[in-house]
Amino acid sequence: LHIFFLHEVSYQKKPIFEMHEFPERLNLLGHRITFLQFDEGFQARREMRSPSSETISGRVYSNAKIHLITPWQFGMPSLDRYLATIVTPFVTLRKLLNDRPDVIVSYSVPTSGWQTLILSKILRIPFVYRAIDVSHKIRKSRFNWLVRLAERFVLRNADVVSVNNPAMARYAIEVMDTRRPVEFNAPPLDLSFAVRPTDQTRSKVFAKYGLEPEDKVLLYLGSFFYFSGLGSFLQKFAPVLKRREDFKFLLVGGGEQEDELKSLAHTLGVSDQVIFAGFVRFIDIWPIIGAANVALNPMTPSDVSHFALPNKVIQYLAMGTTVISTRLEGLESVFGGCDELILENDYARMAQIAEREMLATRPKSIPAAIERFEAEASTKSFETMLSFAAKREDPR
């Protein structure tokens, strides 16, 4: 199959998750992959960037080949996102006409998703919407109501809606207001990466981040979004850090909250124990997770977090690391009942649990629920769904 993926983020800069893993694994199975990105954060000092088309090596699997398309951008991040809704369809239409795919898979909604859906109807190309979050809740904007309309349009008119967890399926069905089935396809987890670190590897991780051998590490991995809950948790965890000098809070990633979190750590007097590691390579996250005593997912409970399935939690659990998380519907629908996942919405109580678990000495264990994300099986499920969609004579 020729599969045309699109998303409203940068393929080359975004931390790795299923938008990289599915296309690259499908390419390794023999499918031709085109990916339309939006290079968020691109800045140009002198001139706009014309549409580009290039073949790149995979970010997860270097032997995979992805044909990457980048539309016009003017180098003004605050303006480019809005302009992209207008200019991207022209690039997309040209590509669809000149190199017609068998099926389109969209992670995108407002930037390029609804426009590509309209084009797919005109050209009679099957359109799959991969719903992994609630689009109109991701960013705070005066235009959220427009994003909500676009999301409803995409959900109600896509030929197939594929979700990554049962809670997201319930949300999609409610918005679709139809009995049309929703496909559940688990995101792929390549367990070949999830190797327990040796003592030597653990020592290297500790040395890299200035940790002492006797330190206990609480890990947060991912983006620092406004709904991450990191600030609220840190305020409650600071007294624990002050009481326990051997406790360290390691934050791997970055985002819009980073400066605010650094300032908060300084104000609370714990900046020496809160370590900002920045983004790391995909291959390097696994020994970090394995070296941590406890991992954290303090996302503020809301629509955007309830219906998502945080990739970091899957990675934490795959390494046998105990996870403390707010109680989120998506997580509970998949991992509910797992002893390795502790759910708590009160941040003060969460800080107490973190202290208890960081001092615990029980061996690490991997929950059985992780098996449903096994990469080969999940990719095969996704491939089967796409093959079925591509063979429809009348995608309407």
At which residue positions do the language-model features occur?
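Nucleotide-sugar-dependent
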Residues: K13, S228, I283-P287, N293-Q315, ...
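Nucleotide-activated donor-binding/catalytic signature segment of Leloir-type glycosyltransferases, i.e.
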Residues: D259-D284
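Conserved donor-binding/catalytic core segment of Leloir-type glycosyltransferases
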Residues: F4, E212-F237, S378
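Donor nucleotide-sugar binding/catalytic pocket of nucleotide-sugar-dependent glycosyltransferases
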Residues: Q37, R148-R202, V274-F276
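Membrane-proximal helix-turn-helix segments that form the acceptor-binding/catalytic region
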Residues: E21-E24, F90-L97, W114, I118-I122, ...
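N-terminal subdomain of nucleotide-sugar transferases
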Residues: L1-T55, V240, L328, E393-R396
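An aromatic- and histidine-rich active-site surface loop
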Residues: I16, H20, R81-V91, P101-L123, ...
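Conserved acidic donor-binding segment of nucleotide-sugar-dependent glycosyltransferases
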Residues: G337-A348, E355-A360
